[in-house]
């Protein structure tokens, strides 16, 4: 059963890189899925299906071709001019994500606790550097452990929230633009995720790739579906702002918001670490 343990670890590292500030706060769910009403849940399933398929495909191909960096991987599937362009864009996006997580955490610390934004940004940077300097084993173990904490906190808080509030869900905007929104959501997230999957491919094989993709599918469907439902329970009842789930927690109690802010912090950290580690492999 060792392959199942490896599959779970790989899935954890992959998920920890996907679940950033936008996911944990619910802003991505709100923007990419909630505005399509009941059709939004179809978008959730489509997005997660794409994530799981891409995870399997990249892991399997990278392992077969022994392409353990995004540069090596892209050289196998793209011609040189396009390969260089996509590679450069991916690394630029990683730098952007790293910067966004730092500034985002600084903003959250200021909004929730009145702490200076610079302090929050520096704290995020220091934590990221410490984890990256631990090397591959430190990166994998830290990301997989934090992914468990993220899933448990988000899942636990969301189930608690389900016990109060409005249960009405409106059906509106029933058109196939929900599919385009789902594809767009997965597309920009995979820019950095591919780099991490290539790094993880050295520890995988076909069976591991399949099971890790299945684990990812189950976990992401659960998290995204319950968050989508909760947003609909409270949309129109309170001002959801740019951090819907966190706002809903604050609506219930400050203690719940503090607990959930841990998940947001861990999510920002793991996303920042994923980008930083992929960049460290490059440079």
What are these regions (language model features)?
Residues 5-24, 93-94, 98, 161-165, ...:
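Hydrophobic, membrane-embedded alpha-helices of multi-pass small-molecule transporters
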Residues 5-7, 32-57, 210-225:
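Extracellular loop-to-transmembrane helix junctions
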Residues 7-17, 42-53, 84-95, 111-135, ...:
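Transmembrane alpha-helical segments of multi-pass small-molecule transport proteins
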Residues 19, 40-44, 75-87, 146-162, ...:
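Small-residue-rich segments of transmembrane alpha-helices in multi-pass membrane proteins
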Residues 45-71, 230, 234:
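Juxtamembrane transmembrane-helix boundary signature
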Residues 57-113, 261-283:
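Hydrophobic transmembrane alpha-helices that form the core helical bundles
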Residues 61, 100-112, 125-146, 202-205:
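Membrane-water interface regions at transmembrane-helix termini and the short interhelical loops
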Residues 232-254:
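Membrane-interface interhelical connector segments
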